[in-house]
């Protein structure tokens, strides 16, 4: 017993000496004390030391464990971590923003990133017809679709992604001023019953997946972005694409929703923990007529591209356009190179409409081709044009008396509105020593250079309007001229515009075609009864004015027998206009000889249509002619 006690005492002393002194514990008693007392105290002190040492070890162990867990967490690839750490589903909502990172940043990236698996998003060949429910424009990278219609999107990868990979579709606004806003449906579609009843997708989500029960609709707790996630499925045998059917549940023009703001659809290939393996994006437009909108956008894009290319190509020249003065007009005999000095200055003009653009392009090409023509040839062409302009008054009416008046306007216009013969001819009468003092404008205008009187033709009407008067005793047909549109003016002046179609349907285009019509003929033309008598009376008045003009023409030609020498020959077009003028008007003259007096033919030579005394004491010319003179 004593031997055992001594061995235990020596062991304790050896252990005690190996420990460092600590002020926490009291000193052991001296060995001079009794054996039994010392042994009892040593055992008691040893028991206290043992308990206090175990308590500090446990406290240190727990503290080390906590520090170790904070400083060096277990590796996620160790089997211990895989067995102990819980596996979070990519579709499960996080319980705290600190436990799980957000699946997307505040402003998602829309940059294409094929990634290690060469991630691609493609579309099937689509139609541009107006009846198409969706169509994709590779030129614009833009999807056009109708609301709630199926839009198949093809997913392709070169190598299989890791297990648990998912495909996320997220809408974001395209413009920088709207990119922080969340793309949601408008309140009208969100709260309505259409497309919402019996659907598992939240009503506020714009993008839905059709025909996939594994689709999860995610509302990010940090950014608030809405997206739809589906597990990646490898392509079936014989295909290289994985097709996902998407639906877009709100129009781009909806007020309170997208409100005509363009959006981008970002398709990402993600791992289980949210790592992006690939990214593709395209613009989306939800509208009523995808084919029409695609065609309009592509046409506008091509026009804008052509304008931008032209601006970029000639940008340096356009900067000098306002600094340099326009080139001077080239002198005669200069070569083409000198004439084109300054042509590098470019100017631009915006044109609305394809037709206007093509017209201006023709003008531009004509100007460029003109620069290639030698200057002497251009001068010769301009001289020919000026000569034609000098001769044009013989073919066209001078602007002093305006367009040709219709017969009814001339009949009802009165003498005070008639132009003079000088105005019709376009120049004053030619002077000649043989011309007498009483030869007025009318007489000089009716004479020819050979001294012969102008032949009178009583049938100078619309049907025989090709006849004219030239120098000599014969007549040659003048050049053709435009059809007389006086039929419309005639019927409109009578208050019968509704009857125009009755005549034009039968090929009657001129007023002269109606002169020989009777009231029975008007009935055969299906003219209404209330207009027949009015039209027939108007035709009778027109005939009377025509007969009076022919009588005046004969009298004037018989009285004016003085020859006009030199080059006083009238051109056929001028005479033709004067004939039309005299035939179509009722001319009144003053009563020269009093009542019942017989007037000689020579007394009519000094009268012209523009004399002021023609307005006084008007009397029809028919009453002034005797029977012998009229024949």
Swiss-Prot record:
Residues 337-372 are annotated as: Interaction with HIPK2. Residues 30-43, 86-100, 306-315 have a biased composition (Polar residues). Sumoylated on Lys-622, which potentiates proteasomal degradation but does not affect transcriptional activity. Phosphorylation by PLK1 and PLK3 inhibits the transcription regulator activity and pro-apoptotic function. Higher levels of phosphorylation seen in striatal neurons of. mutant huntingtin (htt) transgenic mice. GO terms for biological process: cerebrospinal fluid secretion; digestive tract morphogenesis; DNA damage response; forebrain development; hippocampus development; inflammatory response; intrinsic apoptotic signaling pathway in response to DNA damage by p53 class mediator; kidney development. Residues 23-43, 69-113, 306-334 are annotated as: Disordered. There is a cross-link at residue 622 (Glycyl lysine isopeptide (Lys-Gly) (interchain with G-Cter in SUMO)). GO terms for cellular component: cell junction; centrosome; chromatin; ciliary basal body; Golgi apparatus; nucleoplasm; nucleus; plasma membrane. Residues 123-302 are annotated as: DNA-binding. Its cofactor is Zn(2+). Residues 1-43 are annotated as: Transactivation. There is a cross-link at residue 622 (Glycyl lysine isopeptide (Lys-Gly) (interchain with G-Cter in SUMO2)). This is Tumor protein p73. It comes from Mus musculus.
